[in-house]
From Swiss-Prot:
Protein name from the UniProt record: Outer membrane protein B
InterPro entries: Major_OMP_Chlamydia
Family listed: Belongs to the chlamydial OMP family.
Entry GO terms, CC: cell outer membrane; pore complex
Alphabetical GO biological process terms: monoatomic ion transport
Domain of life per record: Bacteria
Coiled coil: none
Chief subcellular location: membrane
Record-level Gene Ontology MF annotations: porin activity; structural molecule activity
Locations listed in the record: Cell outer membrane
């Protein structure tokens, strides 16, 4: 493949990432060359650049490698919402006496999260199957990774996103009050599986794709309800857990700067959902008979992020990676690992 064609492909790929990001929530992409990291250092490996092995022996070609990794993912803000919530826009009372006819007019609305952050700390085991051939389109160069650890999350959203205006008729429009709900969890168990594949390489650059799925269940720390009509703060509690699910797919390009630093650019797209326990507001409903709540799912669907990061090879069997992502999430991911 000519150098002009290679440069053209790189430019086209980077342009595609920039254009797509304006129209498209997602997890960290990671380095596209992860399946062959860190065994690509020229001086320490005494091999051609990014050529892991020149042997054509079948056993050598199929031999894999194991990585023990650590990682932390920190989301500072995120775009998500509760969709299609029926909200009362007007209340009409007809008739007189103790039981007048009350008619409510409703309209569906979407409520955005006002604030949201998430911290994840995990250890991981990754098994990679490198491709020993010199082919530009490798058959292998694939890795499978499993992560386990702890996840803690916080979010704040308008109270009406969790209000239930349809179970009982309202006496007046004044009962449709504005306010805020805050939910904070403790650290709960999280697991994550990912698959990464190098789909093209030329000895200097890599193009890779990946898919990730993350699931967490976090015990509730506190739930705060604050209505503007009543400035008193009410704390609800629950023995349930805050469920969190996320999936993501990504595509990325990396080109090494020198023998020890490998920067990359990637684009990721995915979906996130959060679900608070159904009994989150039971105590508030028992105390205030005119307040009814319905816990609804918070989602962020098919939104994308631009991911920019770099991998540093400290030694022939150790590496670390720092990545930032912008878009529907503003987040930083830090990871590293040892190869065995």
């Amino acid at each position: 493949m000519s150098s002009k064609l290679v440069n053209y492909l790189r430019l086209t790929f980077l342009s595609f990432l920039g254009i797509a990001s304006t129209s498209l929530d997602a997890m960290p992409a990671g380095n596209p060359a992860f399946p062959v990291i860190p065994g690509i250092n020229i001086e320490q490996k005494n091999a051609c650049s990014f050529d892991l092995c020149n042997s054509y022996d079948v056993l050598s070609a199929l031999s894999g490698n194991l990585k023990l990794c650590f990682c932390g993912d920190y989301i500072f803000s995120e775009e998500a919402q509760v969709k299609d919530v029926p909200v009362v826009t007007s209340v009409t009372t007809a008739g007189v006496g103790p039981s007048p006819d009350i008619t409510s007019t409703t309209k569906t609305r979407n409520f955005d999260l006002v604030n949201c952050n998430l911290n994840t700390n995990c250890v991981a085991v990754a098994f990679s199957l490198p491709d020993r051939s010199l082919s530009a389109i490798p058959l292998f160069d694939v890795s499978f990774e499993v992560k386990v650890g702890g996840l803690k999350q916080y979010y704040r959203l308008p109270m009406n996103a969790y209000r239930d205006f349809t179970s009982e008729p309202l006496n007046s429009e004044s009962e449709v009050t504005d306010g805020m709900i805050e939910v904070q969890s403790n650290y709960g168990f999280v697991w994550d599986v990912s698959l990464k594949k190098v789909i093209w390489k030329d000895g200097v650059s890599f193009v890779g794709v990946g898919a990730d799925y993350r699931h967490a269940s976090c015990p509730i720390d506190y739930i705060i309800a604050n209505s503007q009509a009543n400035p008193e703060v009410f704390i609800a509690d629950s023995d349930g857990k805050l469920n969190f699910k996320e999936w993501s797919v990504c595509v990325g390009l990396t080109t090494y700067v020198n023998d020890y630093v490998l920067p990359y650019l990637a684009f990721s797209i995915g979906s996130v959902s959060r679900q608070a326990p159904d009994d989150s507001f039971k105590k508030l409903e028992d105390r205030f008979t005119n307040l009814k709540f319905k816990v609804r799912k918070i989602t962020s669907s098919h939104r994308g992020n631009i991911c920019i990061g770099a991998t540093n090879y400290v030694a022939d069997n150790f590496f670390y990676n720092v990545e930032g992502r912008w878009g529907s999430q503003r987040a930083v991911n830090v990871s590293g690992g040892f190869q065995f």
